[in-house]
């Protein structure tokens, strides 16, 4: 399993990638449709400007009027090929937030839904 933590301005969330699908929740966006895109590099030293070119379009997420997107995407991405790369949340080709995809501990007893609130908890 792989995981990506997004935390930029008021946009926060944790997305887990499993062999069959990706799922979780993202908060802090205005209502509308956004794209999840995997980029070439996992370098966030200059924010989303240093993550390189888009490589894999994961899918669209739909944010409700409360600023919450519940993410559940079927994708055939090979997890071992995305470790160390970046995931961006984008709208109209503008990268709004990004994070590095890393390896996550696998524990079948844990439900993989996590929200980070405005206090970082």
Curated annotation (Swiss-Prot):
- Give an example GO molecular function: metal ion binding
Please give the function described in this protein's UniProt entry.
Virion protein with no enzymatic activity.
Please indicate if the UniProt record lists Nucleotide-binding as a keyword.
no
A GO BP annotation: superoxide metabolic process
Q: Which family does it belong to?
A: Belongs to the Cu-Zn superoxide dismutase family.
| Disulfide bond residue pairs | 48-98
**Source organism superkingdom:** Viruses
Q: Which keywords are on file for this protein?
A: Disulfide bond, Host cytoplasm
Designated name of the protein = Cu-Zn superoxide dismutase-like protein
Q: Which Gene3D superfamilies match?
A: Superoxide dismutase, copper/zinc binding domain
Where is the protein localized? Host cytoplasm
Instruction: Provide the Gene Ontology terms for cellular component.
Output: host cell cytoplasm
Q: What is the lineage of its organism?
A: Viruses, Varidnaviria, Bamfordvirae, Nucleocytoviricota, Pokkesviricetes
The reply on keyword rRNA processing is no
Where it mainly occurs, coarsely classed, is host cell
